[in-house]
Design a protein with these regions (language model features):
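Extracellular-facing/secreted segment signature in eukaryotic proteins
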Residues: 1-141
Length: 141
């Protein structure tokens, strides 16, 4: 049984952690979806800036092509770094975030994990663009 979202009280149960590694010095993204598209998916995007500062943000997509930053940032960066052209990000999220608008609840149901990456970090003040399908893929889990 999963924890409930009651009157704004959030679960204290976390997905232990997820680590992604990609041969890039740009941004890396994972999306949780019920379809093959990122439309209505729960998306996390991270990168390591030129100064070595790791960034991680919670996003969603209404149209399946562009991303919008969530009003509620529910992913927590554990560690992030670049090493010899590889970006490594480890993060976690509560199983139930109570963000019914944009976060996909983690349940026993099958969902699709969609990944993507870019060769460069997002420009300051700009959102990452999810359009390079040569650097994307997915799998049901």
């Amino acid at each position: 049984m999963l924890p409930l979202c009651l009157s704004g009280i959030q679960s204290q149960f976390f997905i232990s952690s997820i680590q992604v590694e990609a041969r890039t010095v740009g941004w890396v993204a994972l999306a949780l979806s019920h379809s093959k598209s990122i439309q209505d998916a729960d998306i996390v995007i991270g990168w390591v800036s030129e100064g070595g500062q790791a960034e991680l943000k919670d996003f969603h997509s209404r149209d399946g092509r562009t991303v919008e930053e969530d009003h509620s940032q529910d992913y927590e960066l554990v560690v992030g770094y670049e090493d010899e052209g590889v970006t490594v990000l480890r993060f976690r999220r509560k199983i139930e975030t109570c963000d019914r608008d944009f976060d996909l609840p983690v349940t026993n149901d099958t969902f699709r994990v969609i990944w993507a990456y870019s060769e460069s970090d997002p420009r300051a003040g700009a959102l990452p663009v999810w359009s390079d399908l040569e650097r994307a893929g997915g799998r049901h889990i």
